[in-house]
Amino acid sequence: MSNDDTYKAFASRPHLVIVGAGATIDSIPNGDKNGQQSAVMKGFIDKLGFTGILADSGIQFDSDNLEDIYSTLAERNDCTYVREKLETEIFNYFSSLEIPDTITKYDLLILSLTRKDCIATFNWDGLLVDAYRRMLKITDNLPQMLFLHGNVKVGYCTKCGNYGYHTYCCPRCHTPFAQSKLLFPIRHKNYNNNTFIKTQWDIFEDFLSNAAIVTIYGYSAPKTDVEAIEKLKSAFIRITQDRYFDQIQIIERPGFNRNDISSAWEDLSTYIHGHLEIKESFFDTYLAEFPRRSVEGYTKRNIAGWWGSSNKTFEKEKGTNYTLKELAMHISPLLTSDPFDSLSLKTL
């Protein structure tokens, strides 16, 4: 294979973005359309006002982490009522979240990728789904979406396996979609028990094994989620060829200590010769520097030795201050151009 063939083969690989609860919080810093907040696992019950439900259990919980609390309830037969009530309230709460009318980082994230790429979310809220539907007004060349713990706004066909917006019907057999179940945070998860969840993970593992760039946005890979971490590692090393040029970028809060990074991400970085970067903002990543051309831009710079800069970016100074029309106009040159043409990648 010639150098040019190697270059093009690398550039054609997907970009995978793994999304956790921190991404939703970052995307709606002032709350959703109605001012409602999301939450991470730690402090989840208190922040979202569910402490009254737990009082009915009569248990004194030593932890404020939802996974610890829910696992305790799941292990006790005398807490079935409380557990089911908590599940219902969580589902209803996340179903009530609505994306703001203004553009969010989720909109930019979705628009920064194309159909060869993938966003895999652990989140229950439907804000990514809302953003995806909004970006369809600009283009239908958008990334594949995967829901690793289910989602309140996603349904699936029990016959054909297709999935989509929860109120839609299967495009093949026209059966109304069944609501995807939420995978609640017990200590020992089984990702194979639910057909929909299993299929989502199968597709996710394929993307992870092939991705040239993996961006981790607001997901900490908690040590307690042993099954997920094992799946991540096994999928990442499935392809045996050298992943020397592959890249991991982690979006973390400003001032994040590199020493606090999840051991799961450090382990993965050993297979790509330490190519792991911590970024303080979405706007510092390849997604924002080379929207819709992230792998192509990364390849041209780091493999082809290009010293240029991107002609179209999502700039930190501009942030999310676009109207939908302005965003469509800003990105329009990248909707029809070749990945390597002068509109998207200019030389100095």
Where are these regions (language model features)?
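Gly/serine-rich nucleotide phosphate-binding loop at the start of the catalytic core
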Residues: 1-117, 122-128, 340-348
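A Trp-anchored, charged/polar loop motif used as the substrate-binding/catalytic surface
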Residues: 1-4, 99-105, 188-206
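SIR2/sirtuin-family catalytic core signature
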Residues: 1-19, 25-27, 203-348
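Short, solvent-exposed loop/turn segments at secondary-structure junctions
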Residues: 22-25, 30-32, 124-127, 151-154, ...
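Conserved beta-strand scaffold positions in the cores of enzyme catalytic domains, especially
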Residues: 119, 145-147, 280
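Short active-site loop/helix that positions an aromatic residue
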Residues: 126-136
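A short alpha->loop->secondary-structure connector
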Residues: 135-146
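Cys/His-rich short segments
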Residues: 147-195
